[in-house]
Amino acid sequence: MKNFWKKTSLLLVTTAMTLSAPLLAWALEHDIVILHTNDIHCGVNDNIGFAGLAQLKKDALAQTPNVALVDAGDAIQGAPLGKLSTGEAVVNIMNAVGYDFCIPGNHEFDYGMARFLELVPQQQAGYYSANFMDLRTKKQVLPGYKLMEFEDKKVAFVGATTPEALTTSTPTFFQDAQGKYIYSFCEDTSGKKLYKQLQKNINAARKQGADFVFIVGHLGMDGTTPQWSSENIAKHTTGVDGIIDGHSHERYERVVQNKKGKDVLLAQTGTKLKTVGQLVITPAGKLETKLITAANGKDAEVQKVIAREMDIYAPLLAQPVGEALVQVHSNDPKTGERIVRNHGCALGDFVADAYKAVLDCDIVLVNGGSIRNELQAGVLTYNDILEAFPFGNMCTVLEASGQQVLDALEMGAMSYPEESGGFMQVAGLSYTIDSSVPSSVMLDEKGNFVKVAGARRVVDVMVDGKPLDVNKIYSVGGNGYILKSAGDGMIMFKGAKLLQDAKISDADAIMEYIQNHLNAKISDKYANAYGDGRITIK
């Protein structure tokens, strides 16, 4: 027997875990090795990179013929290569790497539903999701699971996509022209619909002879909707041996108990290929797992594919935009942790100021989730701008009452100290979050704002030095994802009068601000990583 697990000494490995399974009535000749990734976000050359991942798969195949490579979502969005090719370049690279199973995360839908459905047949591994439903037909949009045979044994992978996709991608992508939802992810406030739908697919896979079943889920743990977390799915289902997870950008391997008290392994690898997960089913039927942080080289053929795809856009992305005299932070320089989703920061101030200058409005609200990378000191290129603002969101200005603004700030602060993509960076106003006050924001089953049921966490809201008037009408600028499409559940602006609609994209607004308002130089006005004090937390 060959044991791949014993052959990994040349790999740098961070953690390891073994989960004993019941002794099986059969024995494999070779290990089954499952390599898994999540939340790559177009990081084709980041960290291990796709070429390193391909080498890991090649090395695994040299030790055992039983190898699968699976992805848990959010692969095709998050950087210029994905934006400019609307996902196709990343799919092409994934095909070259040799994936066997993929699921859509929330950001696979960011180029629109029509575009995602165009990409589905191009993904050679296939896209799978047991809970992605068409409400018009009452059927799954995609296959729910895939059976793979290794020797004479079967392993099933069941896809699961977070219902948070309805609010963390653009909500209108899941609606018809009248604003009625035509797609669902089996969402409700209890989680029962999701558990039932996944259990249905798990049972079907077992009925087809699956010896092991793994959910490959874009679900997450910390900072995600509790009833849709991977841990709660494990606790409310049976017949699952492990959950390969994504969405929350965490790195972990842990064991929880299922509905009947049996162990279920959970694993997630972080983001941008900082690690690759490796799950091994041994000939004795045990599960062993590690997180790998380096590969033994790069696969040359995949490197060529990456270079070919990137060369298409290289001249455009190399165009200079301006210069930053200081690094403009969205991360904490002391820890490296992202703060744009739960704290004031320099880049949040900068983006909000840019929108305010270009859109000429009273107030700007910018969701922290729309800001994806820092701006480094030095010459700035178009690539740098798109790395920070890869969504292509169109800027919008509307009329909103002070009450609507207050509700948006409250919803953005509801998860603090945990991150929230809807956390508001601002211009034209300042506010304080009283973290001693529990959030009383109420949401509907899709995660949309309903009301504030009790005391408010957000206090001392000032507009140009004066207290916010809840009855006054303000011109509010930002991206259409929040203001027009109710992204991150910000439905309080629905029906508001539009003053400017799709005037300019977020990236173009940033470039206009740099070139026409800052004389092509970002000054030390934005040197303080934690911002200029617009957001206070107590």
Give the role of each language-model region.
Residues 28-31, 37, 43, 62, ...:
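Catalytic centers of hydrolytic enzymes
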Residues 18-26:
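C-terminal segment of classical bacterial N-terminal signal peptides
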Residues 2-12:
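Bacterial N-terminal signal peptides that target proteins for export
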Residues 26-298, 342-354, 364, 414-416, ...:
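Acidic, metal/ion-coordinating pockets
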Residues 12-18:
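Gram-negative bacterial Sec-dependent N-terminal signal peptides
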